Each structure stands twice: as C-alpha cells, then as structure tokens.
C-alpha cells in the first residue's frame, strides 16, 4: 500500500520540541508497530511506497525510514509559486496519489495543533485512506 508519512516541521533542529534523533525513534517504533503488529493480525500495514511532501521534519524522517527499509519514495513537493495554498494543494495531491491504487494510508505524527498536518488528516479521512495518527505531546523545556 502507498503510505503518506507526514507531520510537523523542523525548527532550530527540533520537531515539537524533540531532537531529530528522538523523533526518528518515535517514527521508527511506530512504523514497526504498524508493519509487524498492527491493532490486529489482519490490519498489519504493508508499505510498498512512501509518499513524502518533502518538508523538513517528519516528511524527511519518513524518507530516511523508507531508505533504511528499501522502500521506494514518491516525492510530492509543494509548489510555493501558488502562494499560501501550496501546502493544502500538495496534501490533496498526496492523498489522491495514495488512493490511486484503491488502498492507501496516512501515518501522521501530530501535536494536535499543526494546521498542515490537521488538514492532511482530515483530507485522508474524507477520501477513505487508512489513517494512523500518533499524537506527540509537545516537549517543553
């Protein structure tokens, strides 16, 4: 199945207050759980391709995860010449691409606040993708 991996962006080397290394561990462990255990034996997620929005942060960690697992990556960068709607349009393109083979999924690491990730979750739900949201409590110092 084609799987979008999305979430917050990196700012000053942090995502939701966590280092890239800490977020890598969260993503890696969550993907392992989905692929090999899932909420039930029949619901394990077979990942044939990872879809990335090419943003720094969770998107780039998703690409690294795909590389480490020998999984092809489909990059769908935002066309910022379109202005502020570029991120939303990219999310729609990613969702439609994931759905194009009949099955698709979204894995979102979300703090519950990020508007781009919130939109991706809503759109993926609307078009019938399997949606897996891992809520990440923002870490404050």
Model-derived regions, located:
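Acidic/glycine-enriched connector segments
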Residues: 2-3, 7-141
């Amino acid at each position: 199945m084609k799987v979008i991996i999305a979430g917050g962006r990196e700012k000053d080397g942090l995502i939701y207050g966590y280092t890239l290394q800490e977020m890598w561990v969260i993503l890696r462990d969550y993907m392992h759980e989905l692929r090999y255990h899932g909420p039930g034996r029949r619901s394990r997620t077979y990942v044939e391709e990872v879809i990335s929005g090419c943003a720094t942060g969770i998107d780039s960690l998703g690409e690294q995860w795909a590389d480490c697992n020998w999984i092809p990556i489909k990059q769908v960068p935002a066309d910022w010449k379109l202005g502020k709607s570029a991120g939303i349009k990219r999310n729609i393109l990613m969702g439609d691409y994931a759905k194009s083979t009949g099955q698709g999924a979204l894995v979102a690491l979300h703090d519950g606040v990020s508007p781009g990730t919130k939109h991706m979750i809503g759109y993926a739900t609307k078009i019938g993708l399997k949606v897996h949201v891992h809520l990440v409590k923002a870490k404050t110092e």
